[in-house]
Amino acid sequence: MNHKNKSHMKTLVVSVVIAMTSVFNAFSNGNLTQFAYNTTTDGEKVESQTVYTVKNGKYLQQHLKYNYTYDDKGNVSQKEVLKWNEITKVFEKQYCLNITYNAQETSIEYTAWDNKTGAYSDSRAKAVYQTTNAGQGFNYLSYEWNKKENNWNLAKEHAILYGDNALMADK
């Protein structure tokens, strides 16, 4: 895979992580329009980010917290999302995005926090991004966890090719 295709792949993965986080946050909360952020870093790596809602243009109210873990190559391997509980005044675990990489594929698994087990054990969805055709395209595969069968079921598949042969296909 050449440098340009790696760059496209990284951009695509980062975009999807941001989009997935936005979608999950939108479903878990109403129409919040203003946010403030406090980011904690270790060198160039983000360790955590606290998201505040801005009330009346001047008051900050804790909302979400993101914790990041990195693999030995410096790639984000886990993004943990915690939501502020107004009653207990603590951040509570909500879900985790586990990210794995190899030469031709990046996988992002969405796992919800399970209060009964005290762990991220409720797998719900997985997205897989594959480089295809010698770097001339990508496959996007979306899976949903089937609890009865205890395996992943393919929900959507999209193929994206670059150049004159551009094609997008839905399963």
Question: How should each PLM-predicted stretch be described?
Answer:
Residues 1-33:
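Bacterial Sec-dependent N-terminal signal peptides
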